[in-house]
Regions:
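A short hydrophobic/small-residue beta-strand
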Residues: 95-97
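Conserved anion/nucleotide-ligand pocket segment
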Residues: 130, 135-178
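Rossmann-fold NAD(P)-binding glycine/threonine-rich loop
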Residues: 101-124
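Short, hinge-like loop/turn segments at secondary-structure boundaries
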Residues: 48-53, 113-117, 143-146, 169-172
């Protein structure tokens, strides 16, 4: 039997809880850690956080503790890009898969630091674009070329206060028809 892929779940919101359940059900993966930011989740079993049976993986908010774990990959689910967290993860030799679509470090001043972190840790960073979901972005993008939109109904279950100004401008939030 091949070795299981060792996963750390970073953040434990709605999408992450689903990811934890998928990992628990997948015979080729093993959850080895869970990083939380809310004190009330610190020390709680990751399975319980995800609404399933305990997995024997205690969530922590201790950065040094989580980075010391032996893991192949970190599933990173922040509300926005957080380079101050990504750099130490990459330096520790863990590959990062993120639900953030906006990772484009070449266009950011932190690109050299990200590149150095990946080289030092022999790691990689991949943004999948699931945060908070592609479907609403497509509806908004499609409507941007229309001259007569009668209705678009989009429901999101996630606070949007942390969206970047670039994102808001890209989709025309707060603008008039002109």
């Amino acid at each position: 039997m091949t070795e299981k892929l060792k996963i750390i779940q970073w953040y434990t919101g709605e999408i992450a809880r689903h990811q934890i359940r998928v990992i628990a059900d997948c015979p080729s993966m093993e959850l080895v850690g869970a990083y939380v930011h809310h004190e009330e989740k610190n020390g709680v079993d990751a399975g319980e956080i995800a609404g399933i049976e305990p997995l024997g993986v205690r969530a922590t908010n201790d950065l040094d503790e989580i980075l010391a774990l032996d893991a192949d990959c970190v599933l990173y689910n922040p509300p926005t890009e957080r380079y101050d967290e990504i750099i130490p993860i990459l330096e520790s030799g863990k590959n990062v898969i993120s639900i953030i679509a906006g990772w484009n470090p070449k266009k950011r001043s932190c690109y050299p630091a990200i590149l150095r972190a990946c080289e030092a840790g022999q790691s990689s960073l991949y943004g999948t674009g699931l945060n908070p979901g592609l479907s609403y972005e497509l509806a908004l993008l499609g409507s941007s070329i229309c001259t007569d939109v009668e209705s678009i109904y989009i429901k999101t279950c996630e606070p949007q206060a942390t969206l970047s100004e670039v994102f808001l401008q890209m989709f025309g939030f707060g603008k008039t028809e002109e």
